[in-house]
């Protein structure tokens, strides 16, 4: 089947998806059919970043923890143009030990070397994009993707994730305690465990303990991912 044939099938699969797992399976299948290893949906609204992806867990922690969205060349290019585009980390300008050089090297080490990105301008100045990435030097389908279908795909992912988030109901074991919620709220505001301890009067180790319990309940591998999940579920 052609790339656009696979794209049409993907849109149908997304419309039938009942949960995030089904969305992830559909996107991963399409990525592999086009020669890519991973996918990433990203929504940036001011300083807030929300993601849904198949990238390695450690990469998300590094990306969000280091505020790499402020220097990410793919994000920068997506703001300048509104069409599907190909990118490669090998073309990013980077010298010495600059943050951009570190970003490029870490991206490549996590299997993100080239890709194709579908960008769309959202409401109130927000931006959304869907990327398919590969560890290879060049895997480019940007020239054969139907632009209208590509945008339709991105919007389908966006709204399906919103619908699923709205339907998500935490079971009793996932309910956060008042102290866990308190520490989570401060974490969502960018406060470290030590700063939260000073603000709340709770011991710093205890703050970390509450965050660890919240991570376990929401199946998050890191505090940045915990905050992202909590925002998606409307908890903070």
From Swiss-Prot:
GO terms (BP aspect): quorum sensing; regulation of DNA-templated transcription
Gene3D superfamilies associated with the record: Transcription factor LuxR-like, autoinducer-binding domain, Winged helix-like DNA-binding domain superfamily/Winged helix DNA-binding domain
Entry keywords, A to Z: Activator, Conjugation, DNA-binding, Plasmid, Quorum sensing, Transcription, Transcription regulation
Any single Pfam family the record assigns to this protein: Autoind_bind
Coiled-coil ranges (or none): none
Recorded GO MF terms: DNA binding
Protein origin, superkingdom: Bacteria
Entry keyword annotation includes Transcription: yes
Family to which the UniProt record says this protein belongs: Belongs to the autoinducer-regulated transcriptional regulatory protein family.
Protein name, as recorded: Probable transcriptional activator protein TraR
Annotated source species: Sinorhizobium fredii (strain NBRC 101917 / NGR234)
